[in-house]
Amino acid sequence: LKLLPILLLATLAIAASAAEKLELRPGDVVAFVGGTDMVRAQKSGRLEAALTQRHREARPKFRDLAWDGDTVYFQGTVGERWRREAFGGWREQLQRVGATVVIAQFGRIESLDGPARLDAFREAYGKLLDELAAGGRRVFLLAPGPFEWPQADASALADYTRAVKTLAEARGLTLLEGDAVVAGGGEPPPALVAAVREKHRLWSDYWRPANWKCLFGDDSKRVFSNATAGLPSFKQEWETFPPLIAAAEARIFNGEAPAPLPLPARSGSADADTAKELAAFKVLDGFEVSLFADERQGIANPLSVRWDADGRMFVACSDTYPQIEPGVKPNDRIYKLTDRDGDGRADASEVFAEGLNIPTGMEVGHDGVYVGQGTEILFLDWKGGRKILLSGFGNGDSHQTINSFVWSPGGELWFGQGDGIESRVETPSGVSSLFQAGVFRLRPGQLQLDAFLDDFMGPGNPWGVAFDDFGQSFVIDGAGGVFHLTPASVPVRRRLRLPQIGKPGGYCGIECLGAGTLPAAMQGEFLVGDYKKNQVSRFAAVDDGAGFKVEWREPLLRSSHRNFRPVDVKLGPDGAIYVVDWYNPITCHQDDFYRHPTRDKTHGRIWRVARKGATHPAPALRTATDAALFEALRSPERWTRQKAK
């Protein structure tokens, strides 16, 4: 992440033969346009801070209109669903922000198409420049930066860079290129960079808000967005951002430190007694349920659990959901829990990561944690490093963003997204797109991202993928149903929708069972979080011709407590089953007010369900020899086999 802004700043020298120098005037508004490299540069704050420092007397404003995955052929800024209806096309958007200057950067991701598409690139870029320059705007072209991925084929990048230079010369435009930092402006001070980052964060929350499907799209008339209980509507709250942005800009030019951030509003259920919730459970015969962790260990609004090879539990929590409050900086967390004495209850809790924003996807691997939040996949390593691996995932609906990360038997990371989402993600092999609902398969080493079920050809809101012992994958739908996705699937757009093999219901979180602590009849069965029914349901996938059908069994766990909301269920290293309890009276995204006062923001539970009398010591895989790890691949414990890989 640090490399991209440095490289981008290093390209900003003025070509001596340019027809016009990059000089900003009083009243100028600079619009940045481009793809992921421009998005990252804006997020870092260093590019804008350097320009601000050099032109402080002119007090220019900066507006980021860059969008991940944007190319000269298609720009999500104007082309994504509901953007044009809400903000208009390029002409309307540039007028709306008052742009007098445009800095555009394209050509890097397009170069992966090779020399054969150079003519199409020149033509499309020319047409886009005509739109950007309309009304007399001054346009500057930024040369394509180098790839940050060693896997990318950069053989045609020089050809596309020359094409951009030729285009600039033919139009008499300034080309920003070379290896100098912004025209001698020097490295901006950290305080200025921090202030610019904060302003940009506010701008992003305004211009590309999470849940904009509920703001401008086909869900804008539902309960989520309406005013209630004396509180503003979603749109009314969104309209409070421009004054916050203006105040942040004033602080930048006055040399003031960023204003203290307001504290988020946090409500909670008045009666959240764990003993009462425990007494409300009915558990499958032969099993018992106990509390592993709750809000006393910091667990509030938990979304998922995973473990590392040492058996430490990681819990992703989000009290930001469903929508960030204006001006508030999200601080969702991942906690690391340890059961040191093996009594089935967490006795140590620490914050592994904070400052997250609705981390709906999480999986442990490769000496760190993969996190999906909003538009990004992050990798958080054990040493405290944080890196954006990929970005450009959609955020049009915060309960349908990328979620439920899980490793496949082949070592790939699978996850879903819902129908309110459009993702266009730049990768070393080009832009990977998924329109509406579907599932992704990521090979982290190559950053190869494949999309399945493009254009809503399966579940409407996938919230869990699980694999049986033969590699067959089963996807559950938060809007209802179970779907089978064959291992032979390829990333193509289907016109025939997958059949639903399981009855409708609100499912969130799925696990395939395989542990010596469980009865033989349960091996290979599946558990799902049936959150609307306040239970953990159980089914078997039975052969049915070339596919499968679902046969439902008696639920593992049921509750008469309306706040019990199982949203993830996983086998642990000890052979017990762990249930993530969101603990909330609110169950639906669109059909409950986004600031509903009864949304519980302070509680959450992790329940442990174990077979009576069954014990299984957690394996010591971190210190195991290679021979022991190979032997662990033969273990009847699915958890052990997966972690041994």
Please give the residue ranges for each predicted region.
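Sec-dependent signal peptide recognition
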Residues: 1-8
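Hydrophobic h-region of N-terminal signal peptides that target proteins for export
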Residues: 9-17
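Serine-esterase "nucleophile elbow" of acetyl-processing enzymes
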Residues: 18-67, 92-98, 102, 191
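Conserved catalytic region of serine esterases and O-acyltransferases that act on ester linkages
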Residues: 25, 42, 183-267
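Structural recognition of the beta-strand scaffold that forms the well-ordered cores
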Residues: 29-33, 61-66, 100-106, 138-143, ...
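Internal alpha/beta domain cores that form substrate/cofactor-binding pockets in large enzymes
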Residues: 31, 59-97, 102-104, 108-147
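Beta-propeller domains with acidic blade repeats across secreted/periplasmic ectodomains
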Residues: 61, 130, 255-634, 639-643
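Substrate-gating cap/lid alpha-helix
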Residues: 149-179
